């Protein structure tokens, strides 16, 4: 099982991810796209990196707004896996916005 990060580690890493915020024991990113199709295209691009990492985000779609939430459920909070995948998602989101 992945090891939980300390508050100091979380604060350090979230500072390197300006698109993300800490919400309780999760990190979250919200992105708006030009329309529903662009939002769905972006979400579809997340499948491969999530599968490769063996770590899957919670995703909510509301028309052109996508909310992505990461936490490591089996560890009960935030681990390095969350921040690694957040970095990949941030890079992908810059292509689609």
UniProtKB/Swiss-Prot annotation:
Assigned EC number: 4.2.1.96
HAMAP family for this protein: Pterin_4_alpha
PANTHER family xref list: PTERIN-4-ALPHA-CARBINOLAMINE DEHYDRATASE
Catalytic activity: (4aS,6R)-4a-hydroxy-L-erythro-5,6,7,8-tetrahydrobiopterin = (6R)-L-erythro-6,7-dihydrobiopterin + H2O
GO biological process: tetrahydrobiopterin biosynthetic process
Enzyme class: lyase
Family: Belongs to the pterin-4-alpha-carbinolamine dehydratase family.
Keywords: Lyase
Molecular-function annotations in GO: 4-alpha-hydroxytetrahydrobiopterin dehydratase activity
Protein name (Swiss-Prot/TrEMBL): Putative pterin-4-alpha-carbinolamine dehydratase
Record flagged with keyword Lyase: yes
Disulfide bridges in this chain: none
Organism: Cyanothece sp. (strain PCC 7425 / ATCC 29141)
Any Pfam family hit: Pterin_4a
């Amino acid at each position: 099982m992945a090891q939980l990060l300390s508050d100091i580690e979380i604060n350090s890493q979230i500072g390197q991810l300006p698109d993300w915020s800490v919400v309780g024991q999760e990190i979250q990113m919200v992105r708006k796209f030009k329309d529903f199709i662009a939002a769905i295209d972006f979400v579809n691009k997340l499948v491969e990196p999530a599968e490769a990492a063996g770590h899957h985000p919670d995703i909510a779609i509301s028309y052109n707004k996508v909310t992505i939430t990461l936490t490591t459920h089996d560890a009960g909070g935030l681990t390095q896996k969350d921040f690694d995948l957040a970095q990949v998602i941030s890079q992908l989101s810059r292509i689609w916005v």
